[in-house]
């Protein structure tokens, strides 16, 4: 027995002597030390740029709120950022004119998550379009979503920090927004700090000084109708191609210190437009002068479209008639630079308070209806008076749509005569004007009607379902 015990003890001693200890160091560094060194290298990359960075963020059109998704318009935003080695970042933003004028400093951090991540961890300009309150973010997605932008990003290049170039790519950790840091030049930094983004906001605002709906850009001998949507940050170009067909390109835009840039270039044959710059307003001639690349162009008002879409009104009417519902306008007619020129949004009577202005194709068999929709309590209903229309609209040879009044009484006596001189009477007179409308389709569920007299009066329709 003693021999057996000594044998077992000897084997155990040999086993202990042969046991290998696992060493996870590489070049003398533990995993934690290697991670810390890598994160420090990322930070050094950001802070070593002497003139800062331009950060371009683009969304996918999907926003998430606690795992629930909502779809809406895409947006592209531009920021100027200067990082310090103390974890602070100073930025400017093109999201709002106030953010373009005043630099804001907040904190950032670089952490190891699934991948190394750049996290803006205190409220900054980057957080504003993410804000769940639509009163802050102006989000079209609804409460809780923001624009589908992010403020935590993973480095997405397939190289380590030491091999990153002057452009660094990111993916947002919540909404999968795409981010791109581009090392700024001294000229770009100077332009940002001199307030050029704010000046470009002002320059784009000069378009509102052109009272006509149709803004005609002449560039390199080519004419375009352009429409700037500052809410969804989209500019739409419409032109006529060599075959005489209408072509349209709607592109997101963003503003940097050196110009209004298009996320996607507008390509028309041999002409490519990547953005516009140097916007100068001449009040005497109501002309906005711009540059695009090496070319100088002008934007002026036009009383007619570059080419009328002769079938747009029919598409508009048929869509509502087929779906058994109405087109809605939130504020009625815009006239000579004034939104809600007739004061329809203040309309209040025994029917309730104004909610929409509606045009209802084929409301009853053989009759259309142009009428305010009123809110009373929690219910929507028709105003006590409106105007009947004779369907469908008549399309003239030059592409105008004419709407014919059927009077303001009928439908079994439901409606009473319209009070003269009020917002409904003025709206009726414009809607059924003998001048007719040029109809512009923005997308499947959005149209604008432009009064053909001088293109200074229009109404915008959206599909409310």
Annotate each language-model stretch with its function.
Residues 88-248:
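Long, acidic/polar, low-complexity amphipathic helices and coiled-coil-like
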Residues 77-83, 106-109, 148-157, 251-253, ...:
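Hydrophobic/aromatic beta-strand elements that line small-molecule binding cavities or substrate pockets
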Residues 19-117, 189-203, 464-465:
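Acidic/polar, low-complexity intrinsically disordered N-terminal segments immediately downstream
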């Amino acid at each position: 027995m003693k021999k057996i015990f000594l044998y077992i003890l000897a084997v155990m001693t040999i086993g202990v002597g042969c046991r290998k200890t696992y060493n996870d160091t590489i070049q003398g560094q533990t995993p934690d030390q290697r991670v810390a060194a890598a994160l420090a290298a990322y930070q050094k990359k950001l802070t070593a740029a002497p003139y800062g960075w331009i950060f371009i963020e683009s969304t996918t059109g999907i926003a998430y709120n606690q795992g629930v998704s909502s779809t809406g318009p895409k947006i592209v935003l531009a920021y100027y950022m200067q990082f310090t080695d103390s974890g602070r970042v100073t930025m400017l933003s093109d999201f709002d004119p106030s953010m373009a004028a005043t630099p804001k400093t907040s904190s950032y951090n670089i952490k190891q998550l699934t991948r190394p991540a750049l996290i803006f961890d205190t409220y900054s300009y980057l957080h504003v379009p993410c804000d769940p309150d639509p009163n802050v973010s102006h989000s079209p997605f609804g409460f809780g979503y923001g624009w589908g932008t992010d403020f935590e990003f993973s480095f997405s290049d397939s190289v380590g920090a030491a091999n990153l170039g002057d452009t660094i790519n990111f993916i947002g950790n919540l909404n999968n927004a795409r981010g791109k840091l581009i090392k700024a030049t001294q000229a770009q930094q100077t332009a940002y700090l001199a307030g050029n983004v704010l000046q470009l906001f002002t320059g784009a605002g000069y378009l509102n000084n052109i009272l006509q709906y149709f803004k005609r850009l002449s560039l390199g001998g080519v004419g375009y109708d352009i429409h700037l949507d500052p809410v969804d940050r989209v500019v739409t170009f419409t032109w006529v191609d060599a075959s005489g067909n209408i072509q349209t390109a709607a592109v997101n835009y963003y503003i940097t210190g050196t110009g209004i840039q298009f996320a996607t270039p507008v390509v028309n044959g041999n002409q490519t437009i990547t953005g516009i710059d140097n916007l100068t307003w001449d009040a005497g001639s109501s002309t906005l002068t711009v540059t695009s690349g090496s070319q100088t162009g002008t934007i002026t008002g036009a009383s007619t479209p570059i080419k009328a879409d002769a079938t747009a009104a029919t598409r508009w009417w048929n869509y509502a008639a087929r779906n058994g519902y109405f087109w809605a306008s939130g504020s009625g007619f815009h006239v000579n630079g004034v939104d809600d020129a007739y004061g329809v949004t203040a309309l209040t009577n025994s029917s309730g308070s104004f909610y929409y202005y509606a045009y209802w194709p084929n409301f009853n068999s053989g009759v259309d209806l142009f009428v305010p929709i009123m809110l009373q309590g929690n219910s929507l209903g028709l105003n006590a008076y409106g105007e009947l229309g004779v369907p469908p609209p008549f399309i003239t040879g030059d592409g105008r749509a004419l709407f014919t009044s059927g009077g303001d009484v009928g439908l079994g006596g439901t409606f009473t005569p319209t009070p003269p001189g009020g917002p409904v009477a003025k709206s009726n007179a414009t809607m059924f004007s003998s001048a007719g409308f040029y109809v512009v389709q923005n997308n499947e569920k959005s149209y604008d009607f432009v009064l053909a007299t001088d293109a200074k009066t229009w109404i915008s329709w959206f599909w409310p379902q």
